[in-house]
């Protein structure tokens, strides 16, 4: 179903039952344009989203990771469902594909085509689009939860929408990218620029996958050979690259990683946050080391820090959550 809203503050409520087989779609910013941080104005922004539970004025907003989408039921089953932290019987759960994404929302490629070149997007731009969606759904208060890029986007929500965000959960994400993280993204974008059309994106994914795991994790899961003469880790990385290139857009990859790299809130910005926040670090995370995540949490006046102990690196929040769902559920209910 697609609904067209005249303006970003419309109170139109989409009342169809949530369809877990595909997202709902709404068009926002028809009457008043969305003003981007780069100075451009966008009209007719399409947003793809999923909802779970009965619509109401307070909700939990899930923010997806870099290559994710709005189908939380597909990629976060440890968190969504009966008796889990995001229980549709007790909560109204919303997740939208971000601005610039390639899973139903107006994409980076579409923006480039209509604006005669790439359009720089910011995480704050994405938060403003998300807020417009919540306005259209009649949501007035929200609990925000995100991991990886979604965690960085949660920081943007805390800064951009302080009147709307009741509390936030930030998993495996810093408030700002370090030179290490920017360097990894720079290498990925360089690969895409040198080999557009999919081959560069495959290499970008291989670079990213190494930062998402840990040496011990790969030693346990990708040792030896599955094909004679080919190391298992080589087969694994090739498979991951092929899989992403088949479903993801390289312009989206560049736009979203650039937005993450450019998001650099000051310590004063973070100290102004008044909402309670649960920040989760991952003990073996190479991309966002736990010490870095913990240091960002210390800049928030009302943050609790908890660390997930796992050998599986950054992706442990998906691969090896252990007690994480229980910790998150307790915080959201408190």
Swiss-Prot record:
Pathway: Amino-acid biosynthesis; L-methionine biosynthesis via de novo pathway; O-acetyl-L-homoserine from L-homoserine: step 1/1
InterPro entries: AB_hydrolase_1 (IPR000073), AB_hydrolase_fold (IPR029058), HAT_MetX-like (IPR008220)
EC number per UniProt: 2.3.1.31
Primary localization: cytoplasm
Broad enzyme group: transferase
Reaction(s) catalysed (UniProt annotation): L-homoserine + acetyl-CoA = O-acetyl-L-homoserine + CoA
AB hydrolase-1 domain boundaries: 61-318
GO terms for biological process, alphabetical: methionine biosynthetic process
Role: Transfers an acetyl group from acetyl-CoA to L-homoserine, forming acetyl-L-homoserine.
PANTHER family: HOMOSERINE O-ACETYLTRANSFERASE (PTHR32268:SF11)
Official protein name in the record: Homoserine O-acetyltransferase
Source species of the chain: Deinococcus radiodurans (strain ATCC 13939 / DSM 20539 / JCM 16871 / CCUG 27074 / LMG 4051 / NBRC 15346 / NCIMB 9279 / VKM B-1422 / R1)
């Amino acid at each position: 179903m697609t609904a067209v809203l005249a303006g970003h503050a419309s109170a139109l409520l989409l009342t169809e039952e949530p369809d877990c087989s595909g997202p709902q779609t709404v068009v926002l910013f028809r009457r008043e344009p969305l003003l981007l941080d780069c100075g451009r104005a966008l009209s007719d922004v399409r947003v793809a989203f999923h909802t779970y539970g009965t619509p109401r004025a307070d909700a939990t907003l899930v923010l997806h990771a870099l290559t994710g989408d709005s189908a939380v039921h597909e990629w976060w089953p440890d968190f969504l469902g009966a008796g889990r932290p995001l229980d549709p019987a007790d909560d109204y759960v919303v997740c939208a594909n971000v601005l610039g994404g390639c899973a139903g929302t107006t994409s980076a490629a579409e923006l480039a085509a209509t604006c005669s070149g790439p359009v720089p997007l910011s995480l704050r731009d994405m938060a403003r689009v998300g807020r417009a969606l919540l306005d259209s759904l009649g949501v007035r208060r929200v609990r925000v939860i995100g991991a990886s890029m979604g965690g960085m986007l949660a920081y943007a929500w805390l800064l951009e929408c302080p009147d709307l965000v009741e509390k936030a959960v930030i998993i495996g994400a810093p408030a700002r990218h370090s030179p290490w993280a920017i360097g990894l993204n720079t290498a990925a974008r360089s690969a895409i620029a040198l080999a557009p059309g999919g081959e560069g994106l495959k290499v970008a994914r291989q670079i990213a996958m190494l930062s998402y795991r840990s040496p011990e994790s790969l030693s346990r899961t990708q040792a030896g050979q599955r094909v004679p003469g080919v190391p298992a880790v080589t087969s694994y990385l090739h498979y991951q690259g092929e899989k992403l290139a088949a479903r993801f857009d390289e312009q989206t990859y560049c736009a979203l990683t650039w937005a993450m790299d450019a998001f650099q809130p000051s310590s004063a910005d973070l100290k102004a946050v008044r909402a309670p926040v649960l920040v989760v670090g991952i003990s073996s995370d190479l991309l966002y080391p736990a010490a870095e995540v913990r240091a960002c949490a210390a800049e928030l006046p009302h943050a609790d820090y908890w660390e997930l102990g796992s050998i599986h690196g950054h992706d442990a929040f998906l691969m090896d959550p252990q007690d994480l769902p229980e910790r998150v559920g307790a915080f959201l209910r408190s």
